[in-house]
């Protein structure tokens, strides 16, 4: 309790799964976090010792067909996602949440540089987590 300032307002994007490594680290057990853990240790962010942007992966998978569904990323400013049907990318969406907080206007077609950047980040994450969806991302063109 003495490490974390009370009544701290923060816009840190943290997923439920990130609690496991983050809490272990906060309790002094960083070295005991298994290498197989695929979520993030955000303890440095919680303690205010890191200003690095957190990028959270997003998944929507049909459990009977892993080649169909969404994968994406969310940053502090953007939401990016791609959809595949049977292993073929058929939709790419990109929203600027600072200008379009309700995510009504897909700007993927107007922002090819950002699409490539987020596509690269997403593919790296999917390869890291052994998600076969990573192999479909080579077909992203928008």
Q: What are the language-model segments listed below?
A:
Residues 8-11, 107-109:
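Short, solvent-exposed loop/turn segments at secondary-structure boundaries
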Residues 2-6, 12, 17-20, 24-93, ...:
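C-terminal cap/loop subdomain of S1 sulfatases and analogous C-terminal strand-loop tails that border
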């Amino acid at each position: 309790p003495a490490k974390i300032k009370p009544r701290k307002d923060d816009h840190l994007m943290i997923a439920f799964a990130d609690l496991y490594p983050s809490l272990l680290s906060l309790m002094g057990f960083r070295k005991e976090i298994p290498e197989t853990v695929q979520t993030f240790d955000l303890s440095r962010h919680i303690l205010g010792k890191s200003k690095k942007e957190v990028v959270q992966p997003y998944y929507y998978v049909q459990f009977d067909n892993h080649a169909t569904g969404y994968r994406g990323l969310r940053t502090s400013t953007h939401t990016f996602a791609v959809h595949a049907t049977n292993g073929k990318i058929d939709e790419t969406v990109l929203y600027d949440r600072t200008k379009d907080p309700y995510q009504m206007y897909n700007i993927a077609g107007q922002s090819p540089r950002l699409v490539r950047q987020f596509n690269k980040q997403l593919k790296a994450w999917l390869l890291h987590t052994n998600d076969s969806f990573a192999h479909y991302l080579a077909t992203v063109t928008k």
